[in-house]
């Protein structure tokens, strides 16, 4: 009887000492807080290993947290991009519908764009994130539009920017989207007039936006490209009032004025010449009459040479 009681007590003790995935998760979080990332990674991996064969809803929740925690340690604490990308992808494969997966897609998109220049991969991740209708959808739409612009797919960039402006008309990203739309149109051949209208639309809808001055500068550039330097200067002078880089705008103005000067015939537009107030014209030089004058002698010396 005593042996049976002892055995039961031992089993109870062993059961109480058994570590759970939640225990490892807590230890991992403590290690992160205490700046011990290597130890945190060990604990996160132990939690994942214990949960690997358990597909219950609670297990999936813990697994997603463990994988997200490990990926964040690789990226945020150790700056190990390759390892972070691998674990974020593991999270997406095992727990695609978890809240952590949404965050992982957004982070993964940035890593793919910045560190691998995989712009299409980044677009895929953001597009998948948008299917979840996250609260930051307007921002993600804008990021997608910018990525298409970086790819040189200006038509798709214009389309994505339009979608943002239509679906999220009260978002803080609408003026950014309209400016990007105008830039995309500007980059497409044969659509200069449409681009100018798009910039003007931004100025009309958001006159107090910091992008309004940038739109004015771009309208001036379009005028200059069309050879309308005077109109370009008018727009640039207007932009000087609020543009964050007035030196850049002044440079545009100076270059346009030089182009005007280089293409204007001499004396045209000069007030003194137009009203006859300039210096009198120089008389034409008299051709030398003798060989003495030809080499620089005076008329008097020439006459003496000939015995005059």
Question: In which residue ranges do the predicted regions lie?
Answer:
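Acidic, polar-rich low-complexity tracts and alpha-helical solenoid repeat scaffolds
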Residues: 4-6, 16-308
């Amino acid at each position: 009887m005593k042996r049976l009681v002892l055995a039961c007590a031992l089993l109870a003790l062993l059961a109480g000492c058994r570590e759970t995935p939640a225990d490892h998760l807590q230890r991992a979080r403590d290690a992160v807080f205490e700046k011990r990332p290597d130890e945190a990674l060990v604990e996160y991996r132990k939690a994942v290993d214990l949960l690997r064969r358990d597909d219950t809803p609670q297990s999936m929740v813990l697994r997603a947290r463990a994988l997200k925690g490990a990926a964040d340690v690789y990226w945020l604490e150790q700056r190990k991009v390759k390892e972070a990308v691998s674990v974020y992808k593991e999270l997406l494969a095992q727990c695609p519908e978890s809240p952590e997966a949404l965050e992982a897609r957004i982070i993964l998109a940035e890593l793919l764009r910045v560190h691998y220049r995989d712009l299409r991969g980044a677009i895929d991740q953001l597009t998948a994130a948008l299917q979840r209708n996250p609260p930051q959808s307007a921002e993600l739409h804008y990021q997608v539009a910018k990525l298409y612009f970086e790819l040189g797919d200006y038509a798709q960039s214009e389309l994505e920017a339009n979608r943002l402006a239509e679906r999220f008309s009260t978002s803080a990203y609408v003026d950014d989207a309209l400016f990007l739309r105008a830039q995309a149109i500007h980059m497409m051949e044969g659509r200069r007039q449409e681009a100018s209208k798009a910039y003007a639309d931004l100025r009309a809808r958001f006159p107090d936006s910091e992008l309004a001055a940038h739109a004015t500068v771009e309208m001036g550039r379009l005028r200059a490209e069309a050879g309308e330097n005077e109109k370009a200067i008018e727009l640039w002078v207007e932009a000087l009032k609020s543009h964050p880089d007035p030196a850049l705008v002044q440079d545009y103005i100076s270059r346009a004025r030089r182009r005007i000067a280089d293409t204007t015939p001499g004396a045209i537009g000069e007030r003194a010449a137009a009203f006859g107030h300039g210096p009198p014209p120089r008389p034409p030089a008299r051709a030398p009459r003798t060989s003495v004058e030809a080499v620089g002698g005076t008329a008097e010396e020439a006459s003496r040479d000939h015995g005059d």
